[in-house]
Amino acid sequence: MHCPAKINYFFRWANYVKGVIANFHNIGPLEVGFDAAIVTSVPLGGGVSSSAALEVAFYTLLESLSNSLASDKKQKALACQKAEHDFAGNPCGIMDQFVSIFGDKGHAVFIDCMKMEAESVPLDDPNCAVLITNSNVKHDLATSAYAER
């Protein structure tokens, strides 16, 4: 892959965007320039897939700018995962990107990583509640044993 973008270690979040741009160019040309401001309410580093949310949102912006909205969702997830591997140095799995792309309101996402398939599962049982909490436990896949698997 040839990309003139340099990895930035001070503004680490920018590396995710650079990686998405680099991987999008592998799929189709982006023939317009643009300015973008990134604003989020997703807590960074809180274990709620903020990096995948950023990657998928930015990829979706590029699809819109290039009029290539018919992108394959699995290919989109893999491109975003590759961005995280190559530009952020984070050897992540595919779960976060799949959930960001295949998720639907009121549904869980069942992911078969062997087949690289996702399925929406309704969460319509009134006796079931989903609780999301911030444990304040920080993890860093780039420096953990995760990459050895």
Map each language-model feature to its residues:
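ATP-binding N-lobe of GHMP and related small-molecule kinases
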Residues: 1-52, 56-73, 78-87, 92, ...
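ATP-dependent small-molecule kinase catalytic core of the GHMP/sugar-kinase superfamily
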Residues: 67-149
